[in-house]
A protein has these predicted regions:
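C-terminal compact regulatory domains
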Residues: 1-134
Length: 134
């Protein structure tokens, strides 16, 4: 699964998790912008919506969590906000958590600690095909 050149906005409050994800994704050729909470993710997206191909949101973050950030992005009044793929990245992998992610407008869910192959597959499916990943 080739993620070369995919532009990712990653919101993750845990500095170590953010660094690991950034390193692994950049090593695979992705271009990353990392922020520490959902509000920063929304602000970064609003400031430059054309700069990202996909948004990855941790669900549990201070200031604004991933679900609230996804809802806020989906509620923005420009078309790319409705279409940009949003991926939840969380340790909560229960069925109801996944359902909450989908209801918030997210396209996919990746459990932490994440499996790099699975994350690359999800990113490719979402960005290269503009569809929902399983």
């Amino acid at each position: 699964y080739d993620i070369q050149g995919i532009r990712i906005l990653l919101a993750e409050d845990n500095a170590l998790n953010a660094e690991i994800a950034k390193t692994l994704l950049e090593d695979a050729g992705a271009v990353l912008t990392v922020v520490a909470d959902g509000r920063q993710a929304v602000e970064s997206f609003v400031a430059a919506p054309e700069s990202f191909d996909v948004i990855i949101l941790d669900l549990m973050m201070p200031v604004m969590g991933g679900l609230a950030a996804a809802k806020k992005i989906r509620g923005l009044d420009f078309s790319i906000a409705k279409d940009i793929p949003i991926v939840a990245m969380t340790a909560n992998a229960f069925k109801e958590d996944v359902q909450q992610c989908l209801e918030a407008g997210m396209n996919a869910h990746v459990a932490k600690p994440f499996d790099m192959a699975k994350l690359r597959q999800v990113l490719c499916q979402l960005v290269r095909s503009d569809g929902n990943a399983e």
